[in-house]
Amino acid sequence: MKPDTRTGGGPSQRMLRVGELVRHALADVLQRGSVTDPVLAAHIITVPEVRMSPDLKIATCYVMPLGGKDITPVIKALAANARYLRLEVGRRMELKSVPELRFREDTSFDEGARMDALLRSPKVVRDLDDTSSDDTSPDANTDTDKETDAE
């Protein structure tokens, strides 16, 4: 097996592409309502992200019910129906092997809201205003640095 020579440690293009295919297929299955579970039928579920393992055998699906409430029963219902969902995802994709589906709560919306609130806090706004005024003022040291470099 060829060693991983990529730098940066991020996902490969194939991992990203397959993750996106799984995300679309899973969202399609959930949207059509073909799952007979009453918990899943009662919720509209979004699938913002799917992360693939390097060997493409495991798909970690980040899900969130619309409104963000009752996430625990939804995750349990998805896990209970993972076998059926995997079968349906496999029917919609042309892959050698269909990955195992694992479900996790998507916290990206909460993280985004937290960051937005943090950036809007008075202390951060004040600090950002201070740094922007420092960036616009001319720096007296740049001219002297150029003269010493030339010597």
From Swiss-Prot:
It holds the Pfam family RBFA. One of its GO terms (molecular function) is ribosomal small subunit binding. Gene3D superfamilies: 3.30.300.20. One of its GO terms (biological process) is maturation of SSU-rRNA. One of several proteins that assist in the late maturation steps of the functional core of the 30S ribosomal subunit. Associates with free 30S ribosomal subunits (but not with 30S subunits that are part of 70S ribosomes or polysomes). Required for efficient processing of 16S rRNA. May interact with the 5'-terminal helix region of 16S rRNA. Belongs to the RbfA family. Monomer. Binds 30S ribosomal subunits, but not 50S ribosomal subunits or 70S ribosomes. This is Ribosome-binding factor A. It comes from Xanthobacter autotrophicus (strain ATCC BAA-1158 / Py2). The gene is rbfA.
